[in-house]
Amino acid sequence: MADVKPYQIFPTVIYEFNYTPVDKIMMTSYIDQLKINTPQTPDDLHELSYFAELRDKVKEISKQYLDDLQYEYDKIEITGMWANKLNAGDSHAPHTHSNNFLSGVYYLHTNENSSPIQFFDPRVQAHVLRPRNTPNLLNASMMQYNAIEGRGYIFPSWLSHWVPTTEDKRISVSWNIIVRGEYVEPNTLQNAYI
């Protein structure tokens, strides 16, 4: 057998975390009592006291994400945090989170009938030809993660994702993060301070 060494290049990293905030009941009650006509709340939850502990945990894990991937930055800023309240029969169309670096979701209320989050492979060219296969991490065009109460995910904001039609109530909290600091090397005619 030949001496073959496979390389995996251009990875897309998603962090999973499990966490139960002290104010979980208050957070859920606050979202439930809001009288809104859309599935999303206003995006200022990170400024409310009920959500302060979750906000701080999100920043802590985002810092770990950036440090593990060896990014240089001055600070992490949450640009928005909102709740998504889906009822049976609702879905969330495919989307990305423009003008941000990291995004995330935390499941506040779910059960076994709550739809997962599904992420799409951003390399559209990789799926022009699709021989039959046994789906796995190396050949998938979509990956899904179950919506488990008390679990969260942090991912690159450019990564397209959606929520298929859910069979039961599902409350999640989502957020966006901008990374403040120098972007690109100096004198490249593309560098900026954001």
Please name every model-derived segment.
Residues 159-172:
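Ligand-binding loop in jelly-roll beta-barrel domains
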Residues 79, 100-102, 113, 169, ...:
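Residues that flank catalytic or metal-binding motifs in active/ligand-binding sites
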Residues 176:
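An acidic/histidine-cluster motif and surrounding catalytic segment
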Residues 84-154, 164, 179-191:
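Catalytic core of non-heme Fe(II) oxygenases with the double-stranded beta-helix
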